[in-house]
Each structure stands twice: as C-alpha cells, then as structure tokens.
Amino acid sequence: MEGENSSIEKGLLLIRKEESANTTPFLVFTTFIIVSASFSFGVALGHTAGTMASIMEDLDLSITQFSVFGSLLTFGGMIGALFSATIADSFGCKMTLWITEVFCISGWLAIALAKNIIWLDLGRFFVGIGVGLLSYVVPVYIAEITPKTVRGTFTFSNQLLQNCGVATAYYLGNFMSWRIIALIGILPCLIQLVGLFFVPESPRWLAKEGRDEECEVVLQKLRGDEADIVKETQEILISVEASANISMRSLFKKKYTHQLTIGIGLMLLQQLSGSAGLGYYTGSVFDLAGFPSRIGMTVLSIVVVPKAILGLILVERWGRRPLLMVM
C-alpha cells in the first residue's frame, strides 16, 4: 500500500509539473494581448446604459434616433460575426485582430468626436463590426494557443475582461462624459494593436497553411524551451488534416440535427431574452422603475464581475446543463 501511495503521489506531482510547465510567462502575455480588446467589447455593451440622457441632450436627439444609435452595435456585430470565420481562416487570427482594431478604434473616435447623429451612428456601427469579429476570433485564438490542461481557465479570461469593461462603463457613466468613456474604449484596442507585433500566429492556422516548421517554433515558444511538443504538434497536424475535408454543408447532415438545434437554439434564445437591450438601457430602466439610476448602476458595476467568476465556479462544479435548466 505504501508503495502504491508513493506511485500515486509521484503521478500527481508529474501532472502538476506538466501543467505548470505548460503555463509559461510568454503564454500569459500572449493571452493578455489577445483578450485586451475584450474590455473594449464590454465598454461598448455598457456605454449607452448610463449616458443616454447626456448623449441625447448634447446632440439634441429624439428617442427614436437614440434607439437607432443603440441598436447599431447589434447590427454591426451581426455583420462582423458573419464574416469572422472566413477572415480568420483566410488570414489568420492575428491579422483578423488587426482588422478588428481598425474598426474599433475608428468607431470609438467617431463617437468621441461626433458633432451630429451621422458620425455617432457610423461610429457605433463600426464598433459593432469590430466586436462581432472579436466575439469569434478571441476565444478561438486562445483555444488554439493554450494546452488542454489550462484551456478552460484561459478562455474564461475573455468573458472576464468583457464583464470588467461593462462594469467600468456602468460605473463611469454615473459621472463621466460619454465622450471620455468612448476614449477609454480605445485604450485596450491600442494595447492590443501594439502588442500584436510581439505575439505569434496561431500554431493551428500555421499548420493549416502548410507552415509546419513555423508551427513547431511557435508551439515551442509558447510551451517553453524544455517542453516536449512532439505529441501536441502531431495532434494539431492530424486535426488539421481531418478537418480539411469538412465543409459547412456537413453541419446540416441528419446525424448532426440534434446538436445543431441545441447550439443554435441556445444562442438564439439568449438574444431573444432581451438581455442585450436591457444592458443598453439599464439606467433608463431604473429611472422608469422609480429607482435612482446612479445607485442601481453602481450596484450593477460591483456585481457584474463577481457573478461571472461565480458562473465559472458553478459550471466547473455542476456542469452546464443543470445551470441552463435553472436559468
């Protein structure tokens, strides 16, 4: 028994050593650069929540004009998401993020400097296209550079940064100019724009393009000089080869109907719940309910990030299906 316990302890130590070896400083830095613009995504979601009255007053907008302005983030997001996979497959995740920043930075600048409804709407639409691209490429990029042992935690950083952005917009909307908040939305985009010069392309995309040597070099850099990447490299190459003959049409085969219905249904029902609209006009909802919007927005800004962390903990403990049933 003593020898058996010793073997188990050694095995656990090896697993922990492997996990810690996989999480290198360069991997953490690369992930930070990739998810940094997710903060801007969150700011975009919360930008109108506490600034509706001041935007309407400054630019003399009607309720209808402001409603169009708010909805353009969603319309732009639909267009960005529609082309995100094609752009990422053709040019790589890194180039897609550069394209994203062109839309996000120009969009935020147009909002911050807007003197009329045209520039305001154009800016919101451009930011929408940017966050539509982000919503696909960021989680995919992270998943393709991280090892399996820490993939879930690293991918969660995308959602965490989004919630941090929402919380920031909610809180600052109580006392700060909507133009300044728009400029704050640019800061993480600039961090990503510069940081992308120092991070590698996705190893999987490099393998798909037939650049196997570059794939190995990038993977070695991400995992550390002493890490054995032979097995992981082979897994990537096999995966790329297997997916080469899979087309979008394959998803609509009868055997995938159940999975496809669940996947699309969950995403569709999430949007039809009205959560996006509620997020855009949270301050107004509080006012109409007779509750001080400043207090409500402040409380929400405090709750948003912890609830995201709680969600991760509950998912890890109980799984996704029970939580969806409770919701």
Curated annotation (Swiss-Prot):
PROSITE patterns noted in UniProt: MFS (PS50850), SUGAR_TRANSPORT_2 (PS00217)
Domain of life: Eukaryota
UniProt keyword Transmembrane helix, yes or no: yes
Protein name as annotated: Sugar transporter ERD6-like 9
GO molecular function, one term: transmembrane transporter activity
Gene Ontology CC, one term: membrane
Membrane topology of this protein: Multi-pass membrane protein
Pfam families: Sugar_tr
Residue ranges of the TM segments: 26-46, 68-88, 102-122, 125-145, 152-172, 180-200, 260-280, 295-315
Keyword field: Membrane, Sugar transport, Transmembrane, Transmembrane helix, Transport
Taxonomic lineage from the root: Eukaryota, Viridiplantae, Streptophyta, Embryophyta, Tracheophyta
Family: Belongs to the major facilitator superfamily. Sugar transporter (TC 2.A.1.1) family.
